[in-house]
Amino acid sequence: MNYKILYPEAFPVVEMQLNRGESIKAESDAMIAMSSEVDVEGIMEGGVLGGIARRMLTDESFFLQRMTAKRGNGTVLFGHALPGGIMDVDLDGSYGLIVQKGGFLAATEGIEIETKMQGLMQGLFSQEGFFLVRMKGRGTCFGSNTHWFRIYFCSAAGFAEFH
């Protein structure tokens, strides 16, 4: 799997080259185009309750899209509707990534996406709200890199803002 971020300054697009059998999951409105070798299916990451929590609490989609290259190597283009960049972050399993609601765009198959609730004081006084999106596992995550969204690394040692 190879990718590159096209037009990084204005309305960026991620061009993902999938080898046969590889897949990527993304927000339901993130895919712009795909080649004929790629199939799309709707999935509920985290089951029904995970989908409900993601939709009701974080403004993310109830369903995610899984795009799989089934008939040979394929290409998928995805992006978001907001102006600003797209950030790619590789996770190795030793830490996770937390983004504000609306900040998740796509991830490779080794990444789990879940809703995380902040504590009462953090939820009241932070600009992020009570619920965030957490990504963990091994793989690559793609998220919005605009001034509206903050990205945090999380591990057993705590949180650190990512710039």
Say what each PLM segment does.
Residues 1-163:
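Composition-driven recognition of glycine/serine/threonine/acidic- and proline-rich low-complexity segments
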